[in-house]
Amino acid sequence: MMTRFNPQTTLLVVALENELPRAMAAGWNIVYTGVGKINAAMTLCDAIAKYQPQQVVNYGSAGALRPGLSGLHIVTRFLQRDMDVRALGFALGQTPFEDDIEISTKGEGLSCSSGDQFVSAPPEIASDLVDMEAYALAKICRQKAIDFHCFKFISDNADGDAAGDWSQHLATGAKLFAAEILDESPTKTA
């Protein structure tokens, strides 16, 4: 993936410790948010005040909505799939009185829609991946002018088998992320 980060200036943000055990991120500032956008937002705001990072790296699991996706991916487009105020004339995913439906970061990558439900059937908003936290994290980083980087490991296909697949693939994703991103990062900063 060739993306490198400095452990001293980077904050790792992960929903659950079983997605990336603390021992695998030794030497890094890491916080666990808990599940969902509100938990993610509260934890990230507190962590930014405490650590004052130059960049935030979000790692976690995600369900794939596009056939054939597997492994570890960079995500650069973020949507909020459960914001639904269409009855008042706003587009699905649009927060009322805000212009942006999508948050984009630098570079090429996949899209991820976040919402406060574990997806086991395709949602109405089209995206490559689904998760439960990334949109909130990306939005906070944009508002605070902090570089945001997101890596997602495909744990399931966001279908009827998603719950069982998710738990089986967490360790594989953590090992891959640690090997490709964390273990090599002290050599060059992003």
Regions found by a protein language model. Name each.
Residues 3-11:
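Extreme N-terminal starter segment of soluble prokaryotic enzymes
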Residues 17-189:
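Glycine-rich phosphate- or other oxyanion-binding loops that anchor nucleotides, phosphorylated ligands
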